[in-house]
Amino acid sequence: MTSSYKIPKERRLQVYNTVSGSSVIVLLFWYLLLLPNGIFGKTVMINGVAVNTTNSRQLNFALFDAVEYGRMEDVRQLTELGASIKARNRFGNTALLIAARKGHLKIVQLLLDVGSDLQHQNLAGNTALFQATKARRRKVVKYLLASKAAVNVANRQQLTPLIAAAYNGDRKTVQLLLSHGADPTLTDQTGKTALVYASGKGFSKIVGLLLDTGIETSIRYGNELTILMWAAGHSDDVPSQAALKTVKLILSKGANPDLVDKRGQTALMIAAEMGHLSIVEHLLGIGAMDDVRDIEGRTALDLAESENHADVAKLLR
């Protein structure tokens, strides 16, 4: 015998009403979500990506992406839709700093026009001016300076835009920064100035520009080294002719070749130890002392021989 159970009418109505009510809620949710201007905000397409205009995170990410890739009209639209020009990425960069680094001049102009902070520093302490200078974006540098960007702000390593430009060998930007009040005497956290970096890298034209500001050649920097010593002890990646030209320029400005550093070494001794034959030859030619002994009692000849620079040692004998 089979038995059947019929759900009471009252119970059937209760189940139907529950299911129907849930369905209505779900349908209403999707209806509101898909409304172009519903309570969930307007959805716009930015470079093929749907962006909800009430979602500040989506707007700001879209702004960073548009700035990074130089999409001017997208940047304009996003700022009009409410993307924050104050928003920062994980490095502390605002849209302006990104645009400056990438060299997107028109976007830089737009962001400044809508109120971006010209002096904002990211987590490394870099300003938009520093970002543009380091990346060799001269047109952006020029515009930022014309917009009254602070020229001597240093980052967390105490690097200024002028130091960055000198390190890069960017003579025109060095000249531009100096004309807007850049201070050539400022040092980084290692005690080096723009002039020290330019001297050590053989950028003679930049050295000339910086010396023309009135800096004395006898000033000592880290480890009591003068700029002549930095030039004489240049690294091997610096072309020898560029280094020699820099040494000659510094000497022509009155540098004393016989000053010693904290180790008791002269420019001649430093050049001898590094094996820089042409510089040793030039220093000897102008009468640099070759019998000076450092704090360990070594002469230029001793230093050359200790590093197996036979050609330099032969010249010094």
Task: List where the protein language model places each region.
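Conserved ankyrin/ankyrin-like repeat signature
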Residues: D74, K106-I107, K139-V140, K172-T173, ...
